[in-house]
Amino acid sequence: MLLNELHVGAFPSQGSLSDYLAAVGVTQVVDATHPFALTISAELRSVCSLQNLPLIRFERPDHAVDEGSLLARVEDLAGCALSGHRLLLAVGARQLAAAAAAARLAGARVHARVLPTAEAIRHAGLAGLSGEQLAVLRPGSGERSGGLEAALCRRWEITDVVCRQSGGAADQLWSELSRKHCICLWKLKRPEPLLSVDAVHSVNQLCRKLDGDVNGSATDPHHGG
């Protein structure tokens, strides 16, 4: 892919997204955005419908999780048995304030890991997290994947971690660390997929679906792969 074919950053509005797709002559759209990026997914569905563009949703895998540890909302932490626990929040920056407040209501001592961006650090401050309570790093950074996260858990004597059921590298990292170090893992349940959008769950399924669309044949995206 050439650099001039790559768009980096958010689209300021649905209209700008629509204009961009029309300007570059897009004929097929694959939505491979984060499962919690609800706004862009909804805008893609709307724009593709208006422009009569085929839309495929690439769904990330589900890592095994105990249903009892799934949270519908971060506010549900307030009702969890966390009194005296040391909790590490590894959720989106915009959810930090609500998650930290709920965890404190449950009696937990709260720490957080955030991305090294000005917005994330600002949200951490609004959540009352700074100094020794806060780690600023990218998931999986360092010489050994998960090494920094494991060191944080040891330093803070973490008993519980909250992450998002994203299906990505961070989700897998926390799933593995929690099993290895006997940490209780809570996951914020991923949003339900948008209706009326075909979904695939592997690269093989995606390739077959794209080939089928190009050749004018209908391929079931929910089989194989």
Q: Where are the regions that the model predicts?
A:
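N-terminal beta-loop-helix "entrance" segment that forms/cooperates
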Residues: 1-11, 69, 120-127
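Glycine-rich, highly charged phosphate/nucleotide-binding loops
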Residues: 4-24, 134-148
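Glycine/small-residue-rich loop that forms an oxyanion/phosphate-binding "nest" at active or ligand-binding sites
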Residues: 19-77
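Structural motif
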Residues: 27-28, 86, 159-160
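A short helix->loop->beta-strand "cap" motif at the edges of active sites that frequently abuts
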Residues: 49-56, 108, 180-184
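Conserved mixed alpha/beta catalytic, RNA-binding, or beta-rich assembly cores of soluble enzyme
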Residues: 61, 86-143, 151-154, 164-165
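Active-site glycine-rich loop that binds ribose-phosphate moieties when present
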Residues: 66-82, 91-97, 143-146
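C-terminal functional extensions of proteins
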Residues: 156, 160, 164-168, 185-225
